[in-house]
């Protein structure tokens, strides 16, 4: 979650986004960022413990000097973080053009960041191996979305998060954008790991030809 949130705020500063009063427009407040981290790093992380990846125990150990994140992982994290930040800023600029005020635009962006990150748990599982379906992850995502909806509708949580109520149309934008982010992340995942597979295959062929 850190990369999309950081990228969103950074891009907002870079493009000098401002509201109708001329004040700097922050896409997310500190409380909202903490909340997103809480619901997206909690239940989904626990559910991923139950992931089943066929053949993973037959893989040789990684070299001791290998980095924690390989090139494919770095490419995927950077690409998806930038993509999600771009969509978030797009919502922040789109909603006022549709006639909604800045508070609704910021709330729409907040809900998209939360719901979108929950859905991005699925492409984040995909590496050069494809895990088997995980019903615990499905449950974690459903519960996470439910908690996000409750946070939007309960007056206490809405006040604590500085979150304005949004109409049904805006919820359609939230879920539509989240599904779009999911689909784009799936494509980026396949491209990242396919490129890594080509490099590994070329390296193996070179090694085989070396006397």
Language-model features, listed with the residues they occupy:
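Membrane-embedded transport module
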Residues: 1-128, 153
């Amino acid at each position: 979650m850190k990369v999309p949130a950081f990228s969103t705020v950074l891009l907002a500063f870079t493009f000098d986004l401002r509201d109708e009063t001329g004040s700097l427009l922050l896409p997310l407040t500190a409380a909202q960022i903490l909340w997103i981290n809480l619901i997206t790093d909690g239940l989904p992380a626990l559910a991923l413990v139950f992931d089943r990846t066929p053949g993973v125990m037959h893989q040789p150990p990684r070299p001791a000097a290998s980095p924690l994140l390989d090139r494919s992982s770095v490419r995927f994290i950077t690409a998806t973080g930038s993509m999600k930040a771009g969509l978030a800023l797009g919502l922040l600029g789109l909603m006022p053009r549709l006639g909604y005020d800045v508070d609704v635009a910021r709330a729409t962006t907040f809900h998209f960041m939360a719901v979108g990150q929950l859905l991005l748990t699925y492409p984040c599982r995909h590496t050069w191996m494809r895990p088997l379906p995980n019903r615990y992850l499905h449950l974690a995502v459903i519960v996470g979305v439910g908690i996000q909806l409750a946070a939007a509708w309960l007056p206490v949580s809405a006040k604590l998060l500085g979150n304005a109520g949004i109409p049904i149309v805006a919820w359609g934008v939230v879920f539509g954008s989240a599904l779009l982010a999911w689909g784009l992340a799936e494509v980026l995942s396949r491209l990242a790991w396919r490129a890594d597979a080509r490099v590994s295959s070329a390296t193996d062929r070179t090694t085989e030809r070396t006397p």
